[in-house]
Amino acid sequence: MVKVEIDEGSGFCFGVVTAIHKAEEELAKGVTLYCLGDIVHNSREVERLKEMGLITINHEEFKQLHNAKVLLRAHGEPPETYIIAKENNIEIIDATCPVVLRLQKRIKQEYMQEDLDEKQIVIYGKNGHAEVLGLVGQTTGKAIVIEKLDEARRLDFSKSIRLYSQTTKSLDEFWEIVEYIKEHISPDVTFEYYDTICRQVANRMPNLRKFAASHDLIFFVSGKKSSNGKMLFEECKKVNPNSHLIDSADEIDDSLLPGVNSIGVCGATSTPKWLMEEISEAIKAQIKRQ
């Protein structure tokens, strides 16, 4: 009998849970509710909320909107968004994750200090990611974004550096970047770094590795847009090369199933539990048919 197990630690982080709960609460009142960007980087969950009435809009559409109610998702927004909302009489339902909110405030405080010309504010994160855009917005676009260790090489090591991180990035690579900067920065300037990675995300790593290593086959469930999903999937592959990224039951490859004794189903912080359960049931049904 093949064992199919869902990782108990996988699924929405508390920031996403709060955003979805706020959306459902408003929609239950029968109001017209807009969401600025996909509420979560998972197309199935976005579709479920769309069926409930949630209207997803982009920033250009947001600028044209007046006298409406708009949900801001967990990723956070730059200050400009709040200014537009005030000008256009838009009521904001703010679901920005408290971890992201604290980070925005820290970066803004750093930026407001008088020695700005003498230092670089650096954010380790994904260029263009919603959270990163919100963080860079705290510095009126002055912060430097680096996506990986290689990009740290283009920093000016003759100027002081203040390093922060997107909340969902890899802790291991963050520390590699810290060590690289320490080795290369001029002794005449200062380097301060702040591990601002969400602990709920970071703490998933060891448990996820253990889960992936304990099964013959892993199906990692995540939306293709999820930054966190890509990172966690890579962690699975490191300990179990027989790990496969899917975002729906339709993507289960039948040819992988014969000869395995245990199958693990896990996912990102943007993956709903109901979707992992749906995929687990689909796997069991396919095994029965074989």
From Swiss-Prot:
Active-site annotation: E131 (proton donor)
Main enzyme class: oxidoreductase
Residues given in the record as [4Fe-4S] cluster binding sites: C13, C97, C198
Report the HAMAP family cross-referenced here: IspH
This molecule's function is given as:
Catalyzes the conversion of 1-hydroxy-2-methyl-2-(E)-butenyl 4-diphosphate (HMBPP) into a mixture of isopentenyl diphosphate (IPP) and dimethylallyl diphosphate (DMAPP). Acts in the terminal step of the DOXP/MEP pathway for isoprenoid precursor biosynthesis.
Q: What does the note accompanying the cofactor annotation read? A: Binds 1 [4Fe-4S] cluster per subunit.
User: Is Iron set as a keyword in this record?
Assistant: yes
Q: Does the keyword Membrane apply?
A: no
Amino-acid positions noted as binding isopentenyl diphosphate in the UniProt annotation, renumbered to this chain? H41, H75, H129, S226, S227, N228, S270
- UniProt name for this protein: 4-hydroxy-3-methylbut-2-enyl diphosphate reductase
Q: Which Pfam families does this chain map to?
A: LYTB (PF02401)
| GO BP | dimethylallyl diphosphate biosynthetic process; isopentenyl diphosphate biosynthetic process, methylerythritol 4-phosphate pathway; terpenoid biosynthetic process
Ranges annotated as spanning the membrane? none
Which GO MF terms does the UniProt record name?
4 iron, 4 sulfur cluster binding; 4-hydroxy-3-methylbut-2-enyl diphosphate reductase activity; metal ion binding
Q: State the family named in the UniProt similarity comment for this chain.
A: Belongs to the IspH family.
Query: Mind telling me which CDD domains this protein's record contains?
Result: lytB_ispH
- Which cofactors is this protein said to need? [4Fe-4S] cluster
Q: Which reaction does it catalyse?
A: isopentenyl diphosphate + 2 oxidized [2Fe-2S]-[ferredoxin] + H2O = (2E)-4-hydroxy-3-methylbut-2-enyl diphosphate + 2 reduced [2Fe-2S]-[ferredoxin] + 2 H(+); dimethylallyl diphosphate + 2 oxidized [2Fe-2S]-[ferredoxin] + H2O = (2E)-4-hydroxy-3-methylbut-2-enyl diphosphate + 2 reduced [2Fe-2S]-[ferredoxin] + 2 H(+)
